[in-house]
């Protein structure tokens, strides 16, 4: 037994869920960064045929023509089509996501989850343990790799 109340366990579960969302959203954003900035390959999700929140929201906001074109480019990239240049395709997708504010939207969603995670901890007294959890949360959001 942890000695925690149901309310405390629920709060920690909520904190963990929102922390996980922040981590995943940051991972999605980093995938659209430049390799030089993060020191590892980028655009992995797109190349694997996975649509992340920045792409999904950009597709939703885009004109029908732009969305259809980017879907074709992303599909060709994922299928390793010999008819496209992978670097140019990646740059086109990145530009599309920036044009339709997909990255900014993901950052706004991270901030919503950050606030909810901190709110979940509000039932606990201020101490080094709570501070450590908040530090972990901030790291998940502010990491550059």
Model-derived features: positions:
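All-alpha prenyltransferase/terpene-synthase fold signal
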Residues: 1-145
């Amino acid at each position: 037994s942890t000695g925690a109340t149901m309310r405390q366990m629920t709060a920690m579960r909520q904190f963990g869920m929102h922390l996980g969302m922040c981590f995943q959203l940051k991972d999605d954003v980093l995938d659209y960064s430049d390799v030089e900035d993060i020191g590892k390959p980028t655009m992995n999700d797109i190349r694997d045929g996975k649509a992340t929140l920045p792409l999904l929201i950009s597709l939703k906001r885009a004109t029908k023509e732009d969305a259809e074109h980017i879907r074709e480019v992303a599909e060709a990239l994922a299928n390793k089509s010999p008819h496209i240049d992978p670097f140019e395709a990646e740059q086109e997708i990145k530009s599309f996501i920036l044009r339709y504010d997909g990255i900014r939207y993901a950052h706004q969603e991270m901030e919503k989850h950050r606030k909810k995670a901190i709110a979940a901890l509000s039932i606990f007294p201020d101490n080094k343990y709570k501070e450590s959890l908040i530090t972990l949360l901030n790291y998940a959001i502010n990491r550059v790799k």
